[in-house]
């Protein structure tokens, strides 16, 4: 069954097909949205604030999943977020917009390291103190430990 295969691709169980929407966590709902988008075999996916409502550890899991899917399916993402640490984590190139206009554009790492615009600096300073890259490392370690046990 195609729906079950899509759920498995986003690290959910086929049994989840029989659940009601209110029975899912925020992270599970986000995975379902990803599975739905994959159903049409897209070349690119627009992710608009796709992890902003999730706690940071679940954000890291969903972002890792998106990265894995990108490699497996050769996907391109347009990633929209006010959290520049998320954009830096996901994107090779970054465009910072203010009032509907691009005020800064370039490699994500370079912009994050030395932003030219005051607005960009303000966004970076507003980044949550939890570092997504450290959380990704912890999630990877935890997954490795689980796999070692199994």
Across the structure, where does each feature detected by a protein language model lie?
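A short, proline-enriched helix->beta-strand linker immediately N-terminal to the Walker B motif
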Residues: 39-43
């Amino acid at each position: 069954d195609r729906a079950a295969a899509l759920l498995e691709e986003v690290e959910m169980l086929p049994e989840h097909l029989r659940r009601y929407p209110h029975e899912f966590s925020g992270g599970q709902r986000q995975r379902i949205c990803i599975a739905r988008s994959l159903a049409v075999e897209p070349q690119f996916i627009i992710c608009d604030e796709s992890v902003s409502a999730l706690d940071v550890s679940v954000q890291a899991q969903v972002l890792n999943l998106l990265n894995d899917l990108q490699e497996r399916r050769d996907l391109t993402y347009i990633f929209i977020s006010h959290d520049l640490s998320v954009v830096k984590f996901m994107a090779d190139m970054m465009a910072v917009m203010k009032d509907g206009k691009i005020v800064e554009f370039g490699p994500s790492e370079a912009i994050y390291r030395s932003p030219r615009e005051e607005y960009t600096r303000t966004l970076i300073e507003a980044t949550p103190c939890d570092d997504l890259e450290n959380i990704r490392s912890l999630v990877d370690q935890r997954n490795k430990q689980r796999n070692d046990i199994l």
